[in-house]
From Swiss-Prot:
Annotated organism of origin: Paracoccus denitrificans (strain Pd 1222)
One Pfam family in the UniProt entry: Trm112p
Family affiliation: Belongs to the UPF0434 family.
Top-rank taxon: Bacteria
Cellular component, GO, one term: cytosol
Protein name stated in the entry: UPF0434 protein Pden_2369
InterPro entries: Trm112-like (IPR005651)
């Protein structure tokens, strides 16, 4: 078992990140390059390998 995802992200680093709204864990979507907060209904983009954890950059994933 490896500690990196298919894109080379450190799993431990991704596990340490939490939703800035709910403080819930995030799910990594490799295809969309986003960190998903199911609890808040938001998707935070990853650009150039850097998670953008700003609310004004997040995409709403449910109404």
């Amino acid at each position: 078992m490896t500690d990196t995802t298919e894109r080379g992200y450190d799993r431990h680093m991704l596990e340490a990140l939490v939703c800035p709204v709910t403080h819930a864990t995030l799910r990594y979507d490799a295809e969309a390059q986003e960190l998903i907060s199911e609890a808040a209904g938001l998707a935070f983009p990853i650009r150039g390998g850097i998670p953008i954890m700003l609310l004004n950059e997040a995409r709403q994933i449910r109404a």
